[in-house]
Amino acid sequence: MFVAIGSNSDHGERGLENETDRARIWLVDIASGRHRPYATGLRNPVGMAFGPGPAPVLWTAVNERDELGSDLVPDYMTSLRDDGFYGWPWSYYGQHIDTRVAPPNPEAVARAIAPDYALGPHTASLGLAIGAPSGLPAPFAAGAFIGQHGSWNRRPPSGYKVVFVPFAGTRPSGPPQDVLSGFLDEEGRARGRPVGVALDGRGGLLVADDLGDTVWRVRSA
């Protein structure tokens, strides 16, 4: 079983001693209770899903850090390597150093893996589902669906929608496409905030909205 645990802070500002065993995905043996870190340096990994292909790889959607401006840092979706390190808190999106973090750790930065796919800054990309739903039209035939909870500190706002990232084979192959939007009114006030996403057994896409207290089901008319 894979278990995602987010950080206790934005960039370690509460003390790195308070981040022990956090900002990582654990691999847990349910029968014995034994566990070990599977992937580390992930500020807030939320959604997880296995990608397509004969040897499925685990992917996650990661909610990255704030307070570096409206256009940094992009949230992202990435495949995971066993024992891979993805930078947090010392660097972001690979080896871009966050100078706010003390003490620095150049050795950790040097081994930080750049993620596979940027999902935009402050989108709060949380939910993740990967598959080929039969109930959606051809443009959404195979790829990843991401629930974007939406920004709280960006102008203009970002996120507040569900996007689709097409895959070719086992890899992302194009720009994100909106699947479900309209969660902001004309004055920029939220009337819904997508979180979890899942593919149901009848070919539809389920979207949990924790502001509207609603689960939406999306499929072709």
Where in this protein do the model-derived segments appear?
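Beta-propeller domain segments
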Residues: 7-13, 20-31, 43-44, 49-180, ...
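C-terminal amphipathic alpha-helical "assembly" element
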Residues: 197, 204-205, 215-221
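Small/polar loops that bind or transfer phosphate-bearing groups
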Residues: 40, 207
